[in-house]
Amino acid sequence: MAAAIGVCFAAAHYVINIINTNKARQSQVIMQIHAQFNNRQFWDDYFSYMEEEWTTVDEYRVRYEKGSTHEPQIVMWTTFESLGVLLAKKLIEVSAPYDLFDEFCFLFWDKASLLIEYKRSKVPDYGIWTEYLVKRMKEYHAAHPYSETLKQLSA
């Protein structure tokens, strides 16, 4: 699950800079995040929208596996950027404290992976991204040492 931290780096800086740090709302925010991920219509709409993107994703994946100069980040953003930004905006709407970004990433990666597997018979190999994402995670932690989850995972 360490790879989850790397999923939405671009959105993270935007989110962290403007969201509220009110701890009293933490449980409410977590409940809203879970509700969003468990909303079947949300996922059905998302996968319908992304269906046309899968050919591009598969092409990038194959190129990367063959030693192309394309970084895993390109593949990931092709697949996940719209969803990551959408959910980041959701966190902002509910004034999520920035330490919930870890929760957001873990939920995002877990649910997205499971639902992609459900929707597609051929699942891209996410394992090829792990080393790259762990590196990015450590870089992120160095810049944002307040995150206890990142601190533990980067040890």
Question: Where do the language-model regions lie?
Answer:
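Membrane-proximal alpha-helical anchors
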Residues: 1-59
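Long amphipathic alpha-helical segments that form oligomerization/scaffold cores
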Residues: 34-64, 125-143, 147-149
